[in-house]
Amino acid sequence: MNTLITIVLPAGRSAIELSLFVLLPIMVVMLSMMRLLEAWGVLDRLVALLTPILRPFGLTGLATFAAIQVSFVSFAAPAATLAMMEQRGTSDRHLAAAFAMVLAMAQANAAFPLGALGLSVLPVLGVSLVGGLLAASVAYHLAGRGLSSEEQVLDETLKHPVAENAKGVVDVINRAGAEAFRIAISAIPMLVVSLTVVTALRQAGAIQALTNALPFIDPDLVLPAVTKYLAGGTAMLGIVDEQARTGHLSAAQLNAWAGILIHPLDFPGVAVLMAAGPRTARVWRPAVLGALAGIALRAGVHLVLT
């Protein structure tokens, strides 16, 4: 019992520090900017501009908005947009393309906090967009070509608050702050549990055994990768933060592995996005296949860049 307590207490302290002093302020600023641009109609104009360009990749106007959400809010934010696409009659084939794109792109709730640890965020977002487009193309034109392309008449407009005066701006910022607080607080349990489990596995020698069994993989990559694919990007963030603080992970390594570690294609991410609706859940296979292609491209580009 004493051993468990000595593991849990430092894990809890690290989780609180990461959530409240790194994740929360970054998400408050990013969400406030995102919601203000949305309320001022900037995002509406951007979506209208990009939609004709992205159509050949199998993406609709709402899918474009989902790409903005995953890049600047969090991996879970596009779930609401996918649900809206499903309800408004988007075809299964277009749903698969949008789902694949989201799974392959860098998630804001991991990318921006990792910027404080040396991650070059702008290149990550640029490469992420290219990977997302490839993922959507593979899902739409190859993996999902057998899916239905039949669509209803789509309403591509976005329903959101409008900030027409100073009070409206303050209201938007307050709502964004509350949303950021919910994201940060909801991350604490997963961070505590993941840090506790990983510390216990490390002390039991399981991580070292896995590292020895995979000699062709950088030993410093094994722990973040296992954590990321089993427990999600937020849990991975906690592990990477700990490794960076103890000097076991450099900024160069973090940038080289960005394509492998920063995306929602993990068990929690797929589960959350599949919950958007029954049709979205049915197209997970072509979406995952497309996402794998996009992530492979991102991983290769980041390795070349570093």
Language-model features: locations:
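A loop-to-helix transmembrane entry motif
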Residues: 63-71, 220-230, 255
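Juxtamembrane inter-helical linkers in multi-pass membrane proteins
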Residues: 48-63, 150-169, 217-218
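N-terminal signal-anchor module of multipass membrane proteins
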Residues: 1-45, 303
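C-terminal transmembrane helix pair
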Residues: 78-141, 238-306
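Transmembrane helical segments that form the transport core of multi-pass membrane transport proteins
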Residues: 30, 34-54, 169-243
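Membrane helical hairpin/interfacial module
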Residues: 38-47, 55-82
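Intrinsically disordered, low-complexity non-transmembrane regions of multi-pass membrane transporters
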Residues: 1-6, 10, 144-178
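Hydrophobic mid-bilayer segments of alpha-helices in multi-pass membrane transport proteins
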Residues: 23-32, 127-136, 151-159, 187-196
